[in-house]
Structure formats: structure tokens, C-alpha cells
Amino acid sequence: MATVTGYVERIKYRNEDNGYSVLSVADGGEEYILVGTFPYISEGERIEATGRMVEHSIYGEQLAVESYEIKAPEDTLAIERYLGSGAIKGIGAALAKRIVKKFKADTFRIMEEEPERLAEVKGVSERMAMEISSQVEEKRDMRQAMVFLQQYGISMNLAVKIYQHYGPGMYSVIQENPYQLADDIQGVGFKIADEIAAKVGIFTDSDYRIRSGLFYALLQATGNGHTYLPEEELFANASALLNVEPEHMEKHLVDLQMEKKLVVKEKDGKRIVYPAQFYYMELNTARMLHDLNLHSKIDEDDVKKRLKKITEAEKIELDELQEQAVLEAVSNGLLIITGGPGTGKTTTINTIIHYFEQEDMDILLAAPTGRAAKRMTEATGYEAKTIHRLLELTGAPTVDPKNNGNTGENRLEGMHFERNEENPLDADVIIIDEMSMVDISLIHSLLKAVNVGTRLILVGDVNQLPSVGPGNVLRDMIASEAFPVVKLTKIFRQAAQSDIIVNAHKINDGETVPLNKKSRDFLFIRRDYPADIVKDMMVLVQDKLPNYVHAEMSDIQIMTPMRKGALGVEALNKQLQEKFNPPAPNKQEKESGGTIFRVGDKVMQIKNNYQIEWEVRNRYGIPVDKGEGVFNGDTGIIRSINSFAETMEVEFDERRMVEYSFKQLEELELAYAITIHKSQGSEYPAVVIPVHSGPRMLMTRNLIYTAVTRAKSCVCLVGIPEVFQAMVDNEVEQKRYSGLKDRILEIDTSMMQK
């Protein structure tokens, strides 16, 4: 460890969002470069910093600061420079010179203890004197707060958030109930609060601790796709987390109900527990769906005549179910169209669009992801947006301590949709594709922006994996039998020529897939050992498939069922990166969390970031479009890494350029190989899938079905045929607790009683 004490000569770089700075500090005639997070610092201040001396490949020796303390300038020249740096609003270089000339080394004491005397200086009024004193006091309080919070292991960034939220009240919060931080501050979850509580001396059986841990365990379940948990399962999870017996939790469950943080219901004679926000999302979603579910009488013969004109003009052939879907779309306010690959969903959507266009209706198209929206645009010839863009996601982050759904770790933080019940979407017809990916939060937001009387048509394959986020929306809606549903089942002639589509249906039906059959688009290469599987996958991706499917190597995707193991994404990505994008002297790279990110790497966003900004540039580098938000599953290529500014730039679909600070790299992972779960809503020219032994809960029919249906031109499976067939035979589905079906049936029952 090394220590540098001196004056901040110059702030060479500063990120105002997170306080990361590069400082030039003079210590005994020597210049040192300090890098780190400094929430509040100004040129001219005296700093004592401790950290590690590191050698930067471009910028030379630097002190990576781990802790520091700001000290008052000791001589009049330093005081004058500090005051004239802009650190105190209202004081420029000339006024700083007059103040220091008047009070000399006593300047800071005067500012703190006798601020009215500042009015003795020409150009300083009594009011200005008080404002200067207030600023000095605020900076002193902030620094004291930083020192106090850092003794509890709180990072500089979190310390700033805590102080800005509570002010001086933070001391009592930390010492009396640090678990309050998990409710109020983004980035502070239960575990951080629990560590602080242990240092403060709060007992493990504290009411605050049990209540906070119980709620945390419930919120953790939403990360696994659940909107609720059975009470017994919740108590077991919380008991393991807290090391407290389950019988002590009933009282705290009641307390959390009183605080309106959760809702307890009965299902099949047992109690289930919701985070309040998810219960009300389900309830309100059910109500809004019911309101849209209007039926109007139509002249069926007239509709069929119009439909015939459209199909003849557009040279479209519809089967009975597709024709029924069009009739249902005309006569109903809400319609679900579901079916597997090759069953004509796109043709049906196009026909519906043509029909409503002839009625001069305004039509909007959307899908959950950028890739899915792009596919929808290509298939229909009409612009499709992501649902987030359709609803106009916008806003700046704010802290909402009353947000009962706050995990303390992953919130919208004040982001909001401009389109809502007060500013609904201006459309007669809205068509949403890839509905299996839509979670309860997104459907709730969408429905709030849809006027009663607007037709809503939801399209998706119910046999795909459910959404990454909480809920099982499409399946619950269909299972409720409360809405019109058309299930397309016929595989059309052109689609029937594709072994991808034929075999996908065989997989979904649990039939045997012929793996030794010669095929142009569905290939199985037998390899028994992981090392051989990896070797063959590399050859396929680099040498064979790009020419075969006429695609860039980066567009060919390896998908695997698991994260861990020799054929998991973590091990595969390291090997694939070494093969496809090895280190080179001219390639910048950055290590973060055990992963090396290198210019040219393929990466994926692994959590929703609603606030991060993107821009599209023309060939001259001038921005021509901009917006906010990068979402879980978006993939891109690293275009640049700036070690001095500590930023990395990634290009996503549709040429969207996004700048990440190094502290945000935890939101990214390499994407040469991805989990099958992460492939939802995407389509690739070719996919390569390793097939080897793994946990039964992962090696399932709907997982391999999802993987196969992601390929447009070619599927290559490499591994053991018996394992593949075992996956086809394995109907096990991971349990997902979702209550939307029950809420829909409740609403229907209550409406019937009225």
C-alpha cells in the first residue's frame, strides 16, 4: 500500500454520474496521478490518499485509491486556490483573493464560526456570507458522513446515495434499523444491510432483521419467475437465509401485511404470499383484459367476401383456422393466436393487417425484444417496435421509498412509460408478437395504455419457455378459457419441406426424431466427449456454417442448456473467445469480475437497464437518433475500450451505440455461447447446440424445442443422440408460481354475479 499527501493540482477527468475521477496531485514537488471515486473534490483541496500503485499500459504509474481523506488547505496560497476553483458557488478567483487577503490562514474558521464577518469583504453581502457558510458546512458534513459510512464497508457510490437520501438522519437509520436502507436505496439489498447490522451489533433475531429477510426471500422468488410463493416454501427459504426457525415468522408476515408490502391469499386450501405490487399487477391486468374482451356481432358472409378479395389480391392461401382467426379478430376486442413454427402465424397476421387497413384503421405492431421486433418488421413490411419503445419509456432516476416492490437492487428508479391510461396509444388495432416472452409487469404496462375499444391481438407459441421476468402470462390467459383463442396446427407445404419445422413439431409432440436422416437444415453429429463436442462446434461456427447459410460468423449462435460445466456458457465462452478473438497488441481489453472483455468480442446484456443511453450515428460519427434502455438478452459487439476514461462502447442491433462505464460491466457477459433461456425471441441463420448429459430439470422438452425453433436456416446438434431423445421424452417443466389465471377467473366470477 502507498500513501500520497498533497494538493489537487488538476482534475484531469471526471464522470459526474458516479464520481470516478483522475487527479493530478502535487506531493513534495512530485506529481502523482490518482484514480478512483471521489464524490466531492475540487482543485486546490489537500488530500491524503491510500491505495495500490499500478502501472497503466498507456498512462504509466497511477495510485488506485482505496481510501482517502480531505484535509483543509494549510497555507494561504492553497486556500486562495481552493476557493477560486469553483468549489464554493459564488466565489471566483478575484473574490477568493480578497477574502484570503482579509482573513489569511483564519479564512475557514471565519466561514464556519463567524460567517457574518465575510460581509466585511468588498463584494460579499450578508446573505451571500450566509450562503457561503452553508456550503462550507454542507461539504464538511458530507465528508464526515463518507468517513462514517466507509467504516461499515459501504462503497463511495452507495455512501453518496445514502447521504443524499437521508442527510444527517442517516446516522440514526444506520444505528437503529439499517434494514431500512434495503427499502430506500437502490444498490443496497438485504445482504448489504445485514452486514451493516452485524457490525452495528443488531441481534440475529431482531424483528427488523426477520421482517426484512422474509420480504427479501419473497422478492428473490420473483427473480426465478414467480409472482408468489406458498407460505410454507417462503418460510423455508427465509429460514435458510436468516438461520431462524420458521415458527418465528408468522408474526412478521402479519406485520408486512399491515405495512401493505405483501398480500396473503388462499389457493387449494393453502396460503400463498405475494409481494403486493405483483398481486395488484395480476389483479389489474385481469380487470383490464376483461374490459378489452368485447364481442360485437358481424356479418360473417360480408367479412368472408372482403377476406376473399384480400387473399386473391395478395395471393394468400388460408386454412380454416387462419380464416377463423381473421373472423375472431374482426368480431372481438381481444384475441390470442397461438401455434408452433410453420403453422402460418405470420401469414395470419399479414392478412389481419390487410383487412383492417381496408377499414382505414390505425395499426401498431410490437414485440418484447429488438430482434423480435425486427423479425416482425421484415415479415410484415410494417414498422414494429419493441414494447418499451411503443410505450415511450422515459424519465430520470428517482428514489421512491414507498415502492413496495423494491428489491433494493433492480428497480425502474423513476423511469416511466409516457403512454399510459392518461396518454393511451393512438391506435384502432395493436398486434403483439412473441407473447410467451411478455412478463406480468410488461403486459400490465401495455394494457394501461390500451383504450377500451382498441382491438388487441396477442400472438405467440405457448410451448416456448416462459418469460424471464415474473409470471406466465400467455399460458395463464389461454388456460383461463376466458378469451377467444385460435390454435393454429397445420404445417403448411413450404414449411413441411423444412426439417427444422417438422422436427420441432415432433419434439413438441414427444415423438422420435430421426437423427440419421440426410437433411439440408437439421444435422446431428455424434460426439461422446465434451472436448470433441467443443472442437466440432468451433469448426462449424468458423469454417462450415458461414458459407452454408450465407451469414457472418457473429450471427451464428451456440446455445447450451446450462451455465456451469465443460459445456456450460462460462467455460465455452472462454474457449470460444480464445479461438475467435485472441489477444493482440492492437486490441484493447478490460478484465472485470473474472471475465476479459476485448474489442471485437460478442457480448450480451444480462439485466434490464432502463436508464442507459444509446445513439445511432451516421458514417461521419454524427448522432442521428438516440434513446434510453438496453434490455436483458440484447447482444452486440465491443467496438472500443477507453482505459483512461474507463468506458467501453458496444454496438447493438440497429447500429445502437452504448457507452458503459467499467463499473457497469457486470451487466454484460460474453455471448459466443448463450443459454437457451437467453435466446427467447431471437432468430439466427444457424444455431449450434451441444447435447450431453446434464441435470434432468434442465434437459427438458420445451428447452430443446425452444433452441431448435430459434434457427432460420440450419440446426446443428453435436453430442449424444440418446441424450437428445431423453430431452424430447422429458416433459418436466420447472414449477412457476403465477396467479394470473386465478385473478382472471375471479374477475369473471364477480362480473357474472353483478
Put a short name on every predicted segment:
Residues I440-T454, N472-M477:
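Short, conserved "post-DEAD/DEAH" coupling segment immediately C-terminal to helicase motif II
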Residues M1-I298, D302:
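Accessory, non-ATPase domains that flank or precede helicase/AAA+ motor cores in DNA-metabolism machines
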Residues D625, N632-K754:
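C-terminal accessory regions
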Residues L335-T338, I457, Q557:
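Short hydrophobic/aromatic beta-strand immediately N-terminal to the Walker A/P-loop
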Residues E434, G460:
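Walker B catalytic acidic pair
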Residues V462-E628:
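Conserved helicase motor core of P-loop NTPases
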Residues D362, D426-V429, G453-I457, C714:
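Loop/turn-to-beta-strand initiation segments
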Residues E247, D268-V429, I478, P484-R493, ...:
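ASCE P-loop NTPase motor cores of helicases and related translocases
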